[in-house]
C-alpha cells in the first residue's frame, strides 16, 4: 500500500467550485479527510465583446499570454463561437505553468513558451525575445487580478492589450459540512491556492461566522501554494505554516505531506 502521510489529518480546501476535486482526491489518496469549501465561482465576464474582437483580430498580435487554465478555456470557447480553432491562432503562445500548458494541449493548442517557474514574474523574466514594440494579447480575469505581468511587460516597451476572459466571484455561502467543521474546530490545515482564495475565505468567514471568526482557526495550520499567496495569508491571517517550494498543486501536496510528517 502506498504511504499515507496525511492519515488522521482533516484538511479544508478553498479552490474554485468544480476545480477542487482533483486536488482533494490527491489529499484523500495520501490519507487525509478532506472538506471542500469553494471560495471562488468562475463565470463569464460582463461582456464577451472585447475578447471576441481581439480573437477576430488575432493576426495583429505577436503573442498570446495565457496565465491560467481559466483563460485557456475562455479563449477556446470564443474561438469556437467564431468557428475557429487553435490552428487559426497565428501568433506565438506563452503560458504560465505546466498545468495550463496541458489544458491548452488538450484543446489542440501548443505553448511556444513556458517559463521555468510557475509564477507570473518568471514569465516576464525569462521571456524568449525582446518585447519592445511587440503586441501582446492578455485575456485575464475581469476584476481582482494582479497587475505584475502587464506592468513588467509594458515597462520593457511591449504593447499589452488586456481583455476580460472570465470572472471569479466570491460565493455567498459556506457549505454545511465546512461550516460545521469550522464551528467545531475539526480541522488541522487550510490550503490556499491564490491570494483571491484567501481574501474570499476571510470575507465568507466574516459574513457567516461573525467578527471573531479568526479565533475559530487559531489552531489550524495555513498552507500556501507560493510566495504571493503567502503574503496575502500573512496580511489577512497573520501567519503561514506551510508554503510550497514548487508553486503548483503537486508542490503544495508535497509541502503538506512534509508538514504532516513533522507534526505527527
UniProtKB/Swiss-Prot annotation:
Pathway: Porphyrin-containing compound metabolism; protoporphyrin-IX biosynthesis; coproporphyrinogen-III from 5-aminolevulinate: step 3/4. Its EC number is 4.2.1.75. Coiled coil: none annotated. It catalyses: hydroxymethylbilane = uroporphyrinogen III + H2O. The keyword Lyase applies. Gene3D superfamilies: 3.40.50.10090. CDD domains: HemD (cd06578). It comes from the Bacteria. Keywords: Lyase, Porphyrin biosynthesis. InterPro entries: 4pyrrol_syn_uPrphyn_synt_sf, 4pyrrol_synth_uPrphyn_synth, UROS/Hem4. It holds the Pfam family HEM4. GO terms for biological process: protoporphyrinogen IX biosynthetic process; uroporphyrinogen III biosynthetic process. SUPFAM superfamilies: HemD-like. GO terms for molecular function: uroporphyrinogen-III synthase activity. Transmembrane segments: none annotated. Belongs to the uroporphyrinogen-III synthase family. Catalyzes cyclization of the linear tetrapyrrole, hydroxymethylbilane, to the macrocyclic uroporphyrinogen III. This is Uroporphyrinogen-III synthase. It comes from Synechococcus elongatus (strain ATCC 33912 / PCC 7942 / FACHB-805) (Anacystis nidulans R2). The gene is hemD.
Amino acid at each position: 500500500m502506498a504511504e499515507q502521510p496525511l492519515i488522521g489529518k482533516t484538511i479544508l480546501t478553498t479552490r474554485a467550485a468544480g476545480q477542487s476535486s482533483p486536488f482533494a482526491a490527491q489529499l484523500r489518496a495520501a490519507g487525509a479527510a478532506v472538506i471542500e469549501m469553494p471560495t471562488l465561482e468562475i463565470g463569464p465576464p460582463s461582456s464577451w465583446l472585447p475578447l471576441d474582437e481581439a480573437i477576430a483580430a488575432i493576426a495583429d498580435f505577436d503573442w498570446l499570454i495565457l496565465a491560467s487554465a481559466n483563460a485557456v478555456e475562455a479563449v477556446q470557447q470564443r474561438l469556437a463561437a467564431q468557428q475557429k480553432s487553435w490552428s487559426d491562432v497565428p501568433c506565438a503562445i506563452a503560458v504560465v505553468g505546466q498545468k495550463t500548458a496541458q489544458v491548452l494541449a488538450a484543446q489542440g493548442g501548443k505553448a511556444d513558451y513556458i517559463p521555468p517557474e510557475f509564477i507570473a514574474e518568471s514569465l516576464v523574466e525569462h521571456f524568449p525575445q525582446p518585447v519592445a514594440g511587440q503586441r501582446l494579447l492578455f485575456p485575464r480575469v475581469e476584476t481582482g487580478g494582479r497587475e505584475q505581468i502587464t506592468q513588467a511587460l509594458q515597462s520593457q516597451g511591449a504593447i499589452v492589450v488586456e481583455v476580460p476572459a472570465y470572472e471569479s466571484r466570491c460565493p455567498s455561502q459556506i457549505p454545511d459540512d465546512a461550516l460545521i467543521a469550522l464551528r467545531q474546530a475539526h480541522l488541522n490545515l487550510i490550503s490556499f491556492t491564490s491570494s483571491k482564495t484567501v481574501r474570499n475565505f476571510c470575507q465568507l468567514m466574516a459574513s457567516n461566522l461573525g467578527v471573531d471568526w479568526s479565533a475559530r482557526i487559531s489552531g489550524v495550520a495555513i498552507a500556501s501554494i507560493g510566495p504571493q499567496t503567502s503574503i496575502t495569508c500573512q496580511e489577512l491571517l497573520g501567519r503561514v505554516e506551510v508554503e510550497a517550494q514548487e508553486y503548483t498543486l503537486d508542490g503544495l501536496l508535497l509541502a503538506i505531506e512534509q508538514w504532516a510528517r513533522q507534526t505527527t
